[in-house]
A protein has these predicted regions:
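N-terminal export and membrane-targeting signals
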Residues: 1-14
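Structural helix-adjacent loops and short alpha-helical linkers that scaffold large soluble proteins
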Residues: 162-171, 215-227, 272-293, 339-359, ...
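Long, well-ordered core segments of solenoidal/helical folds
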Residues: 174-189, 219-241, 287-308, 355-373, ...
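Aromatic-rich carbohydrate-recognition surfaces in CAZymes
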Residues: 200-303, 328, 332, 485-504
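C-terminal capping/lid segments that line or modulate ligand- or cofactor-binding pockets
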Residues: 255-272, 380-400, 438-514
């Protein structure tokens, strides 16, 4: 573990239901906690390491920890005491589209958003909002004209695109998810994973999903802005850092790069291109094409003799000893996407090169992963992985054996609370907490493989776990309560994509090359 020296953990107890966040200040993570050490800037190489334990049991106060000196920006309503030494992950957001401020769980419990906005109606009836051009919230009388104008602009933005959903409940969830993603999007195109301090970084993976969700709901400018940020932060060798600071100045720590970004970013670009205005999309693709070429060439060059990529940290941000499906599947999607974009850009040599690489990778996946039911790794030692869903549309055309693998994986990862653990690797103890992104993957996969009823049931479970403000949280605890940071951009984007996929013609998938 880079930059981490033996030491001690600082853990305090807060009366915050369902929150467990161990954070390493200078040592190894303790066992038994499912919190978010990796998302804090502690030098730990894994996004999820230290999060895999059983969590708090028995309904008592949850252990909650922050790095020494860690400050927050959560704004309490007047009359609500703010914890002096620690803050909980956010439960919501105030936003003026250029700035954001987190809403504390204690405040969120008695407040509600004014519909279609990030203006908060407090228990007192007054409004709390983030004034334009400001970084601190204000509490004003209901109907305050500047706050009202902000509400009107927010609703106009929603109306400029579309809000997917076949029911009132689904549309309400989609609306809130879209607003949350807009609030987490920075003017430079960076997407904060969440708005608690440890989540205020931009992950290429999360950002790619958000870009695709914006593209498929008619918000072209936002989708393209995210892709522009990806182009600006791409490394010289064609890869990306695991995460960057929101100002684009670089990574906050020395964790290893993750090769899956070389699949996710071309895939997101391809999804944007399908929905972009035809009159301008080729010219705008030309601006992004150097990014695509570097990403796809690096991905193709990384493939070994067996057609698979090398071992790399997967979406768990944990390194495996052998190739994993969480890297191989996104790279296949990205190579197919890049090849199709090359054909659109009249670059036939690029298209042929990346198509050949995609065929090699597809053959390697069929040879090594298919016999194992698309388990996490090719050595068969690390169990089932929710990343099996990345082999399904809208990422890849469903290969042989995938339907059974999806069913088996879902069944083996299902928790008593109705959600999924990310995987059942014997070396990764996730405990009783379900992860909403991992669960929502299956809604998207089943929607894309012609099983809308199964997709709908899973999606409705995820949407039913929104918190009091209607935000989607990162986790759901063993008692079925939303837990950890909310809103989470990644979960929101997957939910929106699944809702789109369940409507009309569904979502497109990058084609296999000719």
């Amino acid at each position: 573990m880079r930059g981490v020296r033996p030491g001690r953990w600082v853990v305090v107890t807060a009366a915050l239901a369902s929150v467990a966040v161990p954070v390493c200040t200078s040592g190894h993570p303790p066992t038994g906690h499912p919190g978010h050490a990796a998302r804090y800037d502690t030098g730990h190489p894994s996004r999820y390491a230290g999060q895999r334990g059983g969590g708090q049991r028995g309904g008592g106060p949850a252990p909650f920890a922050l790095p020494v000196g860690h400050g927050g920006r959560l704004a309490p309503e007047p009359g609500h005491a703010r914890p002096a030494a620690l803050e909980a992950p956010t439960a919501g957001l105030l936003s003026n589209t250029t700035g954001a401020e987190g809403v504390a769980p204690a405040l969120a419990a008695d407040a509600r958003y004014v519909q279609g906005s990030h203006v908060l109606r407090l228990a007192s009836g007054r409004w709390m909002y983030l004034p334009d051009g400001k970084t601190a919230s204000a509490v004003v009388v209901a109907g305050h004209p500047p706050a009202r104008r902000q509400i009107e602009r927010s609703r106009a933005w929603l109306a400029s695109g579309r809000v997917p959903g076949t029911s009132t409940e689904r549309r309400a969830a989609a609306e809130r998810a879209l607003l949350a993603m807009r609030a987490l999007l920075r003017p430079n195109g960076a997407v904060a994973a969440g708005w608690s301090d440890g989540w205020k970084y931009s992950w290429p993976r999360d950002s790619s999903f958000v870009s695709a969700a914006f593209a498929h709901t008619g918000h072209d400018a936002e989708a393209y802005r995210i892709l522009g940020y990806s182009a600006a932060t791409q490394r010289a060798d064609g890869t990306w850092e695991a995460r960057t600071k929101l100002d684009g100045s670089g990574p906050p720590d020395a964790r290893s790069a993750q090769l899956d970004a070389n699949g996710w970013v071309p895939w997101a670009t391809w999804q944007w291109y399908q929905e972009a205005p035809p009159a301008t999309r080729r010219a705008r693709l030309a601006t992004l094409y150097p990014m695509i070429r570097k990403a796809a060439d690096h991905a193709a060059a990384s493939l070994r003799a067996d057609g698979l990529p090398p071992a790399s940290p997967d979406y768990w941000e944990l390194t495996t000893a052998t190739a994993n499906i969480g890297t191989a599947a996104p790279l296949l999607a990205g190579l197919n996407a890049a090849a199709d974009l090359a054909r659109e850009a009249n670059r036939p040599q690029d298209a042929d090169r990346w198509t050949r690489a995609a065929r090699r990778l597809s053959a390697g996946i069929s040879t090594r992963f298919l016999p194992l039911g698309y388990q996490r790794t090719v050595d068969g030692r690390h169990g089932r992985d929710s990343a099996v869903a990345f082999m399904a549309p809208p990422f890849n055309e469903a290969p042989s054996g995938l339907a059974g693998a999806l069913d088996t994986t879902y069944r083996e990862l299902l928790l008593p609370n109705g959600g999924l653990t990310p995987g059942n690797d014997p070396g990764a103890r996730w405990g009783a907490y379900a992860w909403t992104p991992s669960t929502a993957f299956f809604a998207l996969a089943w929607a894309g493989t012609g099983r809308p009823e199964k997709a709908g049931r899973v999606l409705d479970w995820v949407l039913s776990k929104r918190n009091a403000l209607g935000e989607l949280s990162e986790k759901v605890d063993g008692k079925g309560r939303p837990s950890s940071v909310a809103p989470l951009a990644w979960t929101g984007s997957i939910a929106v994509l699944a809702l789109v996929a369940l409507e009309g013609t569904g979502l497109p998938t990058p084609p296999l090359g000719p």
